[in-house]
Amino acid sequence: PGWTLRVVSNKLPALRIEGDLNREGEGIYDKMNGIGAHEVVIETPRHTETLVTMPLKGVENVLRAYRDRIVDLKQDQRLRYVLVFKNHGVAAGASLEHSHSQIIALPIVPKRVTEEIEGAKTYFHYKDRCVFCDIIRQELQQKHRMITENKY
């Protein structure tokens, strides 16, 4: 088909890149326009191929595409948070059967994300250790929830 991976605007975007935020207060509430980015990463031209079945180089291309899109979206001063997510199958909410993922860039950092970051900072302040490193160490040691392990 002449391509290995494509990134396109979502046909039914939750947010639009064009326009101004027009952030303003309305009483105790704040409001703004639905500005942001909503993109679809088409991970392969082959309809039946998935991240699990594609060659390592294909997975590498997908991860590089995520990185490149995040770097580009960070250039837009209106955007504060980028989320990459993947739904697989109708039961998970995917509207396309073809292997794809999505990228959403928001003008705000979601409250839950801010709370998790603050919690990680507090943990580090009290223990002088990274909470995520401690979680990984514990999971590797206990192996209760581990599915597989490799050198990566």
Describe each PLM feature range.
Residues P1-Y152:
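HIT superfamily nucleotide-processing domains
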